[in-house]
């Protein structure tokens, strides 16, 4: 029972922290906070698509696709408890970020983005949730690589 509580605590803790951080930075952005530097600007953009504004032609229907994908991932993770136990923090981060962006779609009609990297090349404008999704995917990959190596070492 204690182990079950532990992974659920990690999952929801990561979920809430990422969701709250992303929404807080977005609220500062919407309140007018702007900043410029040589490398990174804090600005405002409303992305009606997904990464790099892809699928923006779906307009308001994109939020329902986003909702369905998050719902399927939630159901799958709670059905596949082993996967959730192994990657509870990473999936908590991923889903907290996804739900935060989904909330934006329902409230603002798109996702609030604010970070613009422009040193050496102009990158797409992104937000905290986007960064957290990338970090969570990297965590899952790293955990899987080390898990496989550990398994291979035991077989030798």
Swiss-Prot record:
It catalyses: Release of signal peptides from bacterial membrane prolipoproteins. Hydrolyzes -Xaa-Yaa-Zaa-|-(S,diacylglyceryl)Cys-, in which Xaa is hydrophobic (preferably Leu), and Yaa (Ala or Ser) and Zaa (Gly or Ala) have small, neutral side chains. It is a multi-pass membrane protein. Keywords: Aspartyl protease, Cell inner membrane, Cell membrane, Hydrolase, Membrane, Protease, Transmembrane, Transmembrane helix. PROSITE patterns: SPASE_II (PS00855). The chain crosses the membrane at residues 5-25, 64-84, 89-109, 122-142. Pathway: Protein modification; lipoprotein biosynthesis (signal peptide cleavage). It comes from the Bacteria. Its EC number is 3.4.23.36. It holds the Pfam family Peptidase_A8. The active site is at residues 113, 130. Coiled coil: none annotated. GO terms for biological process: proteolysis. It is found in: Cell inner membrane. GO terms for molecular function: aspartic-type endopeptidase activity. GO terms for cellular component: plasma membrane. InterPro entries: Peptidase_A8 (IPR001872). PANTHER family: LIPOPROTEIN SIGNAL PEPTIDASE. NCBIfam families: lspA. Belongs to the peptidase A8 family. This protein specifically catalyzes the removal of signal peptides from prolipoproteins. This is Lipoprotein signal peptidase. The gene is lspA.
